[in-house]
Amino acid sequence: MKKVFLLIATTILNSSILILDSHAGGMMTNTNQNAAFIRNPARDGAIGIDGVYSNPAGVALMPEGWHMSLNWQLAWQRRIVDTQNPVFMRDANNGGSDSKHYRGIATAPFLPSVQLAYNWKKFSFQASGAVSGGGGKCTFDSGLGSFDAAIGRVWAGMLSPVANNLNNLFSAYGLHAKAPVSTGYSSNGFMEGKQYYFGGTIGAAYKIVDKENIKVSGYAGVRFLYGMAGYKAEITDIKVHTTDGAQPLATYINNISNSIYQAGVEAAMTGKTEALQAVTKAGEDLSQQSGQLAKYYNGVYLQSDQNGFGVCPIIGLDVKYQWVNFAFKYEFRTKMNMTNSSTVKEAGLFSAVNQFVDGTSVREDTPALLTLGLELEPLKGLRFDVGYHHFYDRQAKKTYFDANGNRHDDKNQMLSKGTDEWLAGVEYDFGKDKRWTVSGGIQTTNYGNTDEYMSDLSFVTNSWSFGTGVKYKINDKMAVNVGYFQTNYRDYNQAADYRDAAGSNNKFTRRNRVFAAGLDIDF
């Protein structure tokens, strides 16, 4: 029975990334850090002020002077989980069905970013700030399937059989007491998570070769990450349904206890010594089990805030030959230890709560990232872009707790591979003095998801995205970018939930939309 309750704690407390990741990118990384990306995601080989993030070495090829980009993004997302589990048939609120539909709503109304560069002779000094991971809050008003299944397992593992076992015991000894038989259960769930990774970079690029037909520049810099997160989970109004109606959990346990008391009195008064011993033993067992249950009489409420800090180096290279530009960037893995400030003050009740025990820390590394980009401009004002991203997800440490409460820092080893992204885009300058630029691009993202890794508490699925928008040069010193980006996620069918009963399965999908506007200034 202890493992059943351990599953409740594990279910709730392993929900450490139930958030809006409003990004295009890998498991923990936002790559949409400029409005120029929103209108054309294949910016890895492009030269522009947005390159402070996407192609920092190429920024050195911009004209001398100051360059700045101010950006704002609005993102909204839905997470959808369809869960099938045999235990749901006993949920009194589910109409006898073994399936449930869960929908999480997430919004990030204000995602700012800024890129700044000062080019002087062969040098380019750069800095940026953005929400480089996470970016909002996600709320499941009806909880999640893993929540409901945890309560269902408690019912199936203890609440359902206890009355039947007692009634069989009473009948075997000719006692007339009756324990209330349970026919099902019900509860209400709620889950909310928010997470922000604020990233800042400083670095410098240098023109190694600066000739008319070929230019080569290199970059070295550092990224600083500050992570902050908050998680809230509730399971309320837990009730046991019987032939006499629904009863609060405490009331039901009390009625079970009363039936044992009545049986004991009858056994004592009729001189049934063996029956009295058996009933007394049943009472002792119930007392132990009800002691475990007592902390859930008023439901479950857990809240935790986390924060952490990490640093990683970045290197880059840009090679421009006539109308062809190639760029490379590598961001090293960022080690992140997230420290808890939590309502969970001790780990003695369940070892699984170690993930959120106040004052302790867990690993939430940001994986290393390799980007390659190529831009071709065969005609003046017409540019074709392609790019490739690889996130080294499996090498990034991430803490999780198994069903027995044991800590592991290698959850990402459950992935089959790192994340791969392919990008392509096109831009065309037109109008008087080429003041207008229209652009569009696509991106495909493929994760190394496995059934073992996936969970309704933390999931992302393979996707394809498109972005489109325009740029308008107000004058020679200022330009406005406006774009729309949409991600279309594929369904992921999890044949068997590793943390659930046989015969259960999940179908995961998401919907994501982003609108962005930005202002580029040269001075």
What role is predicted for each listed range?
Residues L20-F140, S146-R153, F459, F485:
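N-terminal, post-signal peptide beta-strand-biased segments of exported outer-membrane/organellar beta-barrel
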Residues W66-H67, K122-F125, K211-G218, W323-F326, ...:
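Repeated loop/turn-to-beta-strand initiation elements of outer-membrane beta-barrel proteins
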Residues T509-F523:
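Outer-membrane beta-barrel "beta-signal"
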Residues G58, P109-Y118, A127, G200-Y206, ...:
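Residues on the lipid-exposed face of transmembrane beta-strands in outer-membrane beta-barrel proteins
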Residues D50, T107-P112, K194-G200, N307-P313, ...:
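Residues that define the transmembrane beta-barrel architecture of outer-membrane proteins
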Residues M68-W76, A127-V131, A220-Y226, F328-F332, ...:
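Transmembrane beta-barrel strands of outer-membrane/channel proteins
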Residues S97-Y102, Y185-M191, N298-Q303, Q355-S361, ...:
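Extracellular loop and loop/strand-boundary signature of outer-membrane beta-barrel proteins
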Residues I80-V87, C138-G145, G230-K239, D244, ...:
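Outer-membrane beta-barrel translocator domains and adjoining extracellular loop/strand segments
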